[in-house]
Amino acid sequence: TDMAFLHYRDAAFQIQRAEQVPGQSIAWDMLLSFACSSDDPISGGRHKVLGSKALNIPPQTSTIASHLPKAVGAAYSLGLARRHPPEHKALPDDAIIMCSFGDASANHSTAQGAFNTAQWTAYQSVPMPLLFVCEDNGIGISTKTPKGWIGANFADRPGLKYFPCDGLDIY
């Protein structure tokens, strides 16, 4: 039920999450999106995007790192809702926001603004239930990320906890 703001290469996450929600035709929906079909349930054919309302995945285009500030805002709203319960809410009390991004995206100005906002908020002890997931695979479109840069850059940031893991080690 947690909301997931996905990197534009995260179709596998969306496909796997669809397994948890009966009645989803995610492969078909993605094909409609990739073909810019007016029947695409998330964009109506306007653009190839990942996303699904039923899966709590807001639409995301291929604009680099544009979803990170939105994820920070959503996480801030969850923290705010815990302090001042709204009349209506869409997510459970224990929800978090997951936000994935690629290693090359980490250097983009919108990503830096999102990280800074998350750190600034944490420094003030304002609740922001947010999990950033960096896919550090060295596959940047235009800018290669030096080996070890993500770990070195995130390991000691105030207000952020960095946990390296091997995404290929699934057992």
Predicted regions: what they are:
Residues 1-130, 140-160:
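Cofactor-binding active-site loop characterized by glycine-rich and histidine/acidic residues
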Residues 135:
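Nucleic-acid-processing active sites and adjacent nucleic-acid-binding tracks
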Residues 168-170:
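Outer-membrane beta-barrel proteins
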Residues 161-165:
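Structural signal for short hydrophobic segments within the conserved structured cores
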